């Protein structure tokens, strides 16, 4: 009868061969303790209360670390407070090192120096127009209008809503978001509302047509949130900011009060 191969013995031999290979390459003892169990010699006084980078072979003298190095926070008495492996093969900033000290959880650090847009590859696909030629009124019953320059939006108390800006709301969908992203286009034009930074007026951006897919132009997208008769438009590009109004100001982006962030949607809906 043929002998059944001993898989555990094969794995053991495989690990043994890998250990020998690793020893030749790294010149490290295979019996040494892991990074988390490692102990370190006392540090000189000028290294106390500072961030240091320790690799398996030498101490790094720069704050630019790669994934092969480890970060250690040392207290004034020389006691090691925190140790962590970095998993991203790229440079990180001093702010990232500061986060290690302030973060009570042990885990992977995502460098804050990486811009939001580079951390997400979300694509938003156009579905359909959900509101056609609608008017937006704020809590002061002021309607959204074009300002005199035509480049921005403002608000005014109107007797005739025909003078208010009419919007077409285009709904989008993505695999990652449970909310409803929409665009706000001025009806019968190619002008789309585009979010800006906090307290800056929204812009009217001209596009060739309604985008079928939005990936990089997320300033054009807003999460439409409805609470009863109140409607909120939260920026996809700046998730803490909402389309807002304020007496004497252009329509702008704000977190909340003293600006008004809720609107009523009037006119045709389908």
Swiss-Prot record:
Family annotation (PROSITE patterns): INTERLEUKIN_1
Gene3D superfamilies: 2.80.10.50
Superkingdom to which the source organism belongs: Eukaryota
Propeptide feature: residues: 1-112
UniProt-annotated stretches for the region Nuclear localization signal (NLS): 82-86
Post-translational modification: Acetylated within its nuclear localization sequence, which impacts subcellular localization.
GO-annotated cellular components: cytosol; extracellular space; nucleus
Carbohydrate attachment residues: 141
Keywords from the UniProt entry: Acetylation, Cytokine, Cytoplasm, Glycoprotein, Inflammatory response, Mitogen, Nucleus, Phosphoprotein, Pyrogen, Secreted
Role summary: Cytokine constitutively present intracellularly in nearly all resting non-hematopoietic cells that plays an important role in inflammation and bridges the innate and adaptive immune systems. After binding to its receptor IL1R1 together with its accessory protein IL1RAP, forms the high affinity interleukin-1 receptor complex. Signaling involves the recruitment of adapter molecules such as MYD88, IRAK1 or IRAK4. In turn, mediates the activation of NF-kappa-B and the three MAPK pathways p38, p42/p44 and JNK pathways.
Similarity comment: family membership: Belongs to the IL-1 family.
Protein name: Interleukin-1 alpha
